[in-house]
């Protein structure tokens, strides 16, 4: 479904993100009492009166000021208006009409986009009508008093909004693959997003922390629809102060949790840091498919063996993700960027894959023939009766054995490796659940499922 888009526009700190959260009935937009919290444009879906649409939140718009990030924020606002079906100009009722409001209103009047004025911070209905009346001078029609914090007036505002929107262009509601771009600050995540999209979708700067929110971007590659999430850079907890970065990092962790596949971006120049290792552990812990993207490869002096040496060194430190594909790219030049989708799609497919019990047991039987389960000093030997896949996302296998304690970590890793070697599963973690059960307790189950035991007591 292609949804009509509403662009939320206004000066810094007039309550745009709070209003977005109110209209979308969510807390996805970061709200903090400080100008410049929202920089890139961020999207959320909403519905009202049986009509669905998406709202794009933008940074505070300031003309004639070239201070840090303001030119880039302007570019993001301009792009948001280009794709919008409707603009919602948010102003501060308590402050009244400012020169900034007049400049934005003039720009909107010269655009071809229909605009509705929302006068925010009108907590009292009676007083709100009085405060809103001043904004007739913007020349954009009737101003509408609302309170983003308390919700008053937002229902009437939404009634106006859906009345101005075009009918939804309904297409096949195709599944979207959720891909999050994860990494430390300044490893090139936003540059990678821009390279993938072929436009300046996110603000890029050498200053750490430019991205403070998680940015969702829809893109179609081949037959697949992707939702790409660019996340805030994640630093050590002790270096993170309460505020926008704190909220952004929480959003980034949530992005991992809701992803089908994570793209962990590593800086080729800096190599793997402690924080990279923690992020790798988080991805593995959440059971997400993953590919490792080594960015800034264009900055490395190379010979014929460099890539192999670097990969070996990186993998030795990213042992949590030993199963992930590693590719070397340059977001700046676009080198190998398109390969990301191929490997990410393969990782997603492997993450969702199911294997029949008969195939699983063929692999286990062959694995045992090459290397028998260990025998304890007491003379008791491990017996592996059979295995079956019990779920996917990530692929999870239950292995029924006589006593899990007889199977040490070395042999468990061997079995996992054999499953990967014989069945694939590149790009996804595997979970092996070792369950102790007496053979006689399994007899009815294996007879019912027509399973042949690999080993018997």
From Swiss-Prot:
Single GO MF descriptor: ribosome binding
Domain of life assignment: Bacteria
Residues that, per the record, bind GTP 2: 183-190, 230-234, 295-298
Any single Pfam family the record assigns to this protein: KH_dom-like
Domain KH-like: 353-438
SUPFAM superfamilies given in the database record: P-loop containing nucleoside triphosphate hydrolases
PANTHER family: GTPASE DER
Quaternary structure and interacting proteins, as annotated: Associates with the 50S ribosomal subunit.
This protein's name: GTPase Der
Organism: Prochlorococcus marinus (strain AS9601)
Lineage of source species: Bacteria, Bacillati, Cyanobacteriota, Cyanophyceae, Synechococcales
């Amino acid at each position: 479904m292609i949804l009509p888009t509403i662009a939320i526009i206004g000066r810094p700190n007039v309550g745009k993100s709070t209003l977005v959260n109110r209209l979308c009935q969510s807390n996805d937009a970061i709200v903090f009492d400080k100008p410049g919290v929202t920089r890139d444009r961020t999207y959320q879906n909403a519905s009202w009166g049986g009509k669905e649409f998406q709202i794009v939140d933008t940074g505070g718009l300031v003309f004639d000021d070239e201070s840090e990030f303001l030119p880039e924020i302007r570019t993001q606002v301009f792009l948001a208006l280009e794709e919008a079906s409707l603009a919602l100009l948010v102003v501060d009722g308590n402050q009244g009409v400012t020169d900034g409001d007049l400049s934005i209103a003039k720009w909107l009047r010269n655009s071809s986009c229909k605009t509705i004025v929302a006068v925010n911070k009108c907590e009292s209905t009676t007083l709100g009508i009085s405060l809103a009346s001043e904004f007739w001078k913007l020349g954009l029609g009737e101003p509408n008093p609302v309170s983003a914090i308390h919700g008053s007036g937002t229902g009437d505002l939404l009634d106006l909004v859906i009345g101005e929107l075009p009918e939804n262009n309904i297409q096949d509601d195709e599944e979207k693959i959720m891909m999050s771009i994860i990494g430390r600050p300044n490893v090139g995540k936003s540059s990678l997003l821009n390279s993938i999209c072929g436009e300046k979708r996110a603000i890029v700067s050498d200053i750490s922390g430019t991205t403070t929110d998680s940015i969702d971007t829809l893109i179609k590659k081949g037959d697949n629809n992707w939702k790409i999430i660019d996340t805030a850079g994640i630093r050590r907890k002790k270096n993170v102060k309460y505020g926008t970065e704190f909220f952004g990092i929480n959003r980034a962790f949530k992005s991992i949790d809701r992803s089908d596949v994570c793209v962990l971006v590593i800086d080729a120049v800096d190599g793997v840091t402690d924080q990279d290792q923690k992020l790798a552990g988080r991805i593995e812990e959440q059971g997400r498919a993953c590919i490792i993207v080594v960015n800034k490869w264009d900055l490395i002096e190379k010979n014929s063996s460099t890539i192999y040496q670097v990969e070996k060194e990186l993998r030795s430190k990213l042992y949590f993700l030993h199963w992930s594909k590693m590719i070397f790219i340059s977001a700046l030049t676009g080198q190998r960027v398109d390969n990301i989708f191929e490997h990410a799609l393969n990782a997603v497919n492997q993450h969702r894959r199911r294997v029949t019990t008969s195939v699983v047991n063929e692999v286990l039987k062959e694995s045992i023939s090459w290397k028998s389960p260990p025998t304890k000093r007491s003379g008791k030997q491990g017996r592996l009766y059979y295995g079956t896949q019990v779920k996917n996302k990530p692929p999870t296998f239950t292995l029924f054995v006589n006593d899990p304690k007889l199977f040490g970590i070395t042999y468990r890793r061997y079995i996992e490796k054999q499953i990967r070697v014989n069945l694939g599963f590149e790009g996804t973690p595997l979970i092996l659940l070792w369950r102790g059960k007496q053979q006689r307790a399994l007899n009815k189950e294996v007879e019912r499922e027509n399973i042949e035991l690999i080993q018997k007591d």
